[in-house]
Every structure is written in C-alpha cells, then in structure tokens.
C-alpha cells in the first residue's frame, strides 16, 4: 500500500512537471516571436482588394493553391502535401481579416487590413504577422512573394 501511494505521488509530480514544461515551452515560443508590420500599396478599390483577402475563393489564386472554408476555419493547401489550418478570429467586412494558425500560440496571428491614404489616393494592404527572431527577413520575403502573386492575379 505504501509503495502504491508513493507511486501515485510520483505520478502526480510527473504530471505537474509535464504541465510546467508545456507552459514554459508556450511562454518561450511566444517570447521568441516578434511582430512584423508591412505595407503594400495596391492599385485597386477597397471592394476589389476585399474580394481577394476576405473570401476563400479570393485567397486561393494568390495566397495558397487551394483554400477551403467551413464556418470560421480555413484550410490552406500548397502543392500536394503542405496543409495548414487557420481560424478566423476577427473580421470587419471590407476592412480586415485576422487569422490564427491552429498550430501557433494564441497570442500570434496574421492580419490583412485595407487602408486608404488621402494624399496618394491609394489603398494599402497592411500586413501584421509574427516570426521567430532569426526568420523575420524570410517571413517578409514570403509576404513580398505572396503580394506579388496577388498583384499578378488581380492586376492591382
């Protein structure tokens, strides 16, 4: 009986340790990511830009090879094997969409927001994203490539 009691205490402590390790991992992953903000001027109306960022049909020609949407869950496919799931966490029609990758921390997201500059009379697509400290330039390059795809697909 004493051995069984000691084993149960050890098992509880192991679970506590396991939970503690998971919490530390989450905190470290949050701390290691930095916010990225990029602006891209686009030659198109807000409604045209919105069609490309606010719907799965609009996202599929430029952001991913295929995009499926069920309720607030978007599944993005690249090539034959890469797939990622994101949840739509906020949206204001005609203004912005904000997604959180399913496999990322709750505090990270990526957002696409449409703004208008009165001086230049151009719309801008503002991107907010998060990346590991050593991968910031790679992430920016990826967004540059994605926006170039958007411009080619849409004529913006």
Residue map of PLM features:
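Hydrophobic pocket/interface hotspot
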Residues: 49-50, 59, 74, 88, ...
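Glycine-rich portal/gate segments that line the openings of hydrophobic small-molecule binding cavities
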Residues: 54, 60-105, 109
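Hydrophobic ligand-binding cavity/cleft-lining segments
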Residues: 6-9, 14-67
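A short, structured loop/turn motif at beta-sheet edges
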Residues: 46, 90-93, 115-122
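A generic structural signal for beta-strand entry/edge sites
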Residues: 33, 73, 94-96, 120-124
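Well-ordered beta-strand positions in beta-sheet-rich domains
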Residues: 37-39, 83-85, 109-111, 140
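Beta-strand/loop substructures that line and gate deep hydrophobic ligand-binding cavities in soluble
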Residues: 98-152, 156
């Amino acid at each position: 009986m004493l051995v069984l009691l000691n084993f149960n205490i050890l098992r509880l402590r192991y679970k506590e340790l396991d939970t503690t390790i998971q919490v530390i991992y989450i905190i470290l992953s949050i701390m290691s990511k930095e916010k990225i903000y990029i602006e891209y001027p686009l030659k198109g109306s807000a409604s045209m830009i919105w069609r490309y960022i606010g719907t799965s049909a609009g996202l599929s020609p430029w952001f991913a090879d295929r995009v499926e949407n069920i309720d607030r869950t978007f599944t993005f496919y690249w090539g034959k094997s890469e797939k990622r799931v994101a949840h739509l966490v906020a949206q204001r029609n005609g203004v912005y969409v904000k997604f959180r990758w399913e496999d990322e921390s709750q505090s990270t997201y990526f957002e696409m927001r449409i703004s208008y500059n009165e001086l230049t009379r151009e719309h801008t697509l503002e991107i907010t994203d998060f990346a590991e400290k050593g991968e910031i330039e790679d992430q920016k390059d990826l967004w540059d490539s994605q926006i170039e795809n958007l411009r080619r697909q849409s004529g913006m």
